[in-house]
Amino acid sequence: MKDVILIANAGSSSLKISIFEIQNKKVKDKIYNIFLEKNVNKILFHINKKQESATDIKDDAIEMMIDLFEDWWKKQENLNLIATGHRIVHGGKNFNKPVIVYEKVSKDLTVLIPLSPLHQPYNLQVLDLFLQKYKEISHIACFDTSFHFTNPPITKAFGLPKKYYDKGIIRYGFHGLSYKYVSSHFKEMTKEDLPTKTIIAHLGSGSSLCAIKNGLSLTSSMGFSVLDGVMMGTRTGNLDPGVVLYLIDHEKMTTKEVTELLYKKSGLLGMSGESSDMRTLLASNSPDAKFAIDLFVYRIVLEIGKLTAALEGVDCLIFTAGVGQNSAVIRKMITEKLLWLGIKIDDTKNQKNEHLISTSDSKVKVFAVPTNEELIIAEEVMKFL
């Protein structure tokens, strides 16, 4: 029988479950990649990218996903579940590292739902369901915000009265699990030490950038929420707060409508009027699609400039996540606007998606590497066993 740990990443309409084999107290291989998604009135169940079933939705979708998983799990007689790990988007001001979850911790995390209303409820719903169904094992919560606890106070503050800072209205930063994976596995992937002043660009459906100094997060593009920073697939990125006030006061939009607009109808999708998928936009002949891509690139270039200033220089730029690792076109568009940093890209290496894509005489080393949030959670879980 194989000992395994389960890693869960829940969204509003989907649940990703990765199952890793454990040998000699170390994470060995991912043996199952399970994806459940809500599709119109059915829940689709995929195992290792193959659809296994389509079930009519008759109840709460997330609860049904867990039940479908459990039905499948009961048939896996050769697997022994020893722990679960859960991606939790927001850890607030108190959770600066992964924790074993018990009743009080679960209540403390529930209090943070207003800080991440579109992610935290589903993260916690799945966590609580696993707590109920598998009481005899440990359940570990890993936070996207924890990596940024090393940010100095000056980088966290808004220009609001201090009482709001004290209440936790600060810049938290997100995608921390991705940044932790890339920074901690960098030498393993590239055979090089992580340079002192590094900027990591996590570019996917959600995008952010992080300035890392001596291996620690200094500041990042996302702030109080995952809306901040660069433009994303469906999110606005950095937005003048006056726009929100205008939408409410003059466009007569409700806060719910504004939330829907900022999180789900903006970004690449809103600007192009076509898609949030970069591959679709790159293949499009639409002027609006081209403008959306140009704006995406422009905002990223500005953010790299800002983070370079925060670091007082930059030694290394790392692209990661779906777009960052895989789109040679987007990397080229970004780096062509960074010639002032002395960046030079080897077009052949870039087209091949090699890890090191800069030339030997580039003043800043540029890399394109994968991220693996599930694996970094699995490694964190093992520290508790």
Curated annotation (Swiss-Prot):
Positions of substrate binding: 87
UniProt remark on cofactor binding: Mg(2+). Can also accept Mn(2+).
A cellular-component GO term for this protein: cytoplasm
GO molecular function: acetate kinase activity; ATP binding; magnesium ion binding
Keyword DNA-binding: no
Residues annotated as the enzyme's active site: 144
Residues reported in the UniProt entry to bind Mg(2+): 9, 373
Main localization, broad class: cytoplasm
Domain of life: Bacteria
InterPro entries per the UniProt record, alphabetical: Ac/propionate_kinase (IPR004372), Aliphatic_acid_kin_short-chain (IPR000890), Aliphatic_acid_kinase_CS (IPR023865), ATPase_NBD (IPR043129)
Record's subcellular location: Cytoplasm
Biological process (GO), any one: acetate metabolic process
Pathway(s) of this molecule: Metabolic intermediate biosynthesis; acetyl-CoA biosynthesis; acetyl-CoA from acetate: step 1/2
Catalysis performed (reactions): acetate + ATP = acetyl phosphate + ADP
Binding site for ATP: 16, 202-206, 277-279
EC number: 2.7.2.1
Keyword Transferase in annotation: yes
Cystine bridges: none
Cofactor: Mg(2+); Mn(2+)
This protein's UniProt keywords: ATP-binding, Cytoplasm, Kinase, Magnesium, Metal-binding, Nucleotide-binding, Transferase
Assembly mode: Homodimer.
Functional description taken from the UniProt entry: Catalyzes the formation of acetyl phosphate from acetate and ATP. Can also catalyze the reverse reaction.
Similarity section: Belongs to the acetokinase family.
Entry protein name: Acetate kinase
Naturally occurring in which organism (per UniProt): Rickettsia felis (strain ATCC VR-1525 / URRWXCal2)
